[in-house]
Amino acid sequence: MESLFLLVLGNTEISTVPGISVAGATPELTKLTPVADAEYLFHEKPLTIDVIPVTPEGHPTPAIITKAARELANFPVLVVRGGTYLAPLVPHVHISDAVGRDFRKEPALPEFGDIIKRAKLFGEELNKTPIKELVIGESTPGGTTTAQAVLWALGYEARTSSASPDNPQSLKEKVIAEAFERAGIEKGQLRDNPLEALRQFGDPMMATVIGIALGFRRDIVLAGGTQMLAVSALLKALGEDLSRFMIATTKWVANDKSATFIETAKEIGIISYAADLDFSKSEFKGLRDYERGYVKEGVGAGGATWLAVKAGFSPEDVSEKVEELYRRLMEMK
């Protein structure tokens, strides 16, 4: 087996700050998005809730892209519970049920050490298999805000993306400023103490991916946008050689003018791939709006597309399959 796709699920209380995350129809529903995303990959629709996760405007979860790529290329998917409110109702590896706290009030992840340790054990077991490459995606509502906080703590002048075309950058910065004040630190102050940056401002997805990457010593594709930049920056600060890593995301993240994906990836020193999906001709507004900056990435959409392309399919094939899956969803309503 050449490649294994891991989907790491995480929750953080930050997703319930009004206006921060649109990875769910309401702030409260963002708590269920990770498990619903995982369930949708294996079933016609999620089991925990009866609908697929959508933004408040009704745009479908990027899990639809991952599912489309998987239906084409048939790569194996393993779900990893990094730290969520609920367990997904699909087979999964349990790392923790610790949820990231609201970092304005307290350190985000006191359990980071246990999570890294367990995830590293899991990575070490995967290292004993013939798998040559892990492609690691994530579903973590609120995760672009924790990512930006971690990147700032490590000294990167980064702006992270958002699943909304109106990136709530000023709200993110206000929330992060409050967190830095609580922790008594300034930008860049934790560049030599990455684990403290993770403890203070991170989320369980980051800790899980770091642990897996420390245990599995072959090639790793970090399948995500700006959230995986935070993971890369933490790995680099921990002394990892980034030459065995790459980030796979979508063109919607790479082209996001409100964020600094390309610049920050360069600054960290990690190569990236941006899946050239195109929904502009879709018959569904929910998909066409991806081209207007809605949703952009998540659930390893870019990495799943990359696996499909490696298996001989084109980004157009993936886009067509997404259209078909979305039609199936509409017919089920």
Swiss-Prot record:
HAMAP family: UPF0284. One of its GO terms (molecular function) is nicotinate-nucleotide-dimethylbenzimidazole phosphoribosyltransferase activity. CDD domains: DMB-PRT_CobT. Pfam families: DBI_PRT (PF02277). This is UPF0284 protein TGAM_0534. InterPro entries: Nict_dMeBzImd_PRibTrfase (IPR003200), Nict_dMeBzImd_PRibTrfase_arc (IPR002805), Nict_dMeBzImd_PRibTrfase_sf (IPR036087). Belongs to the UPF0284 family.
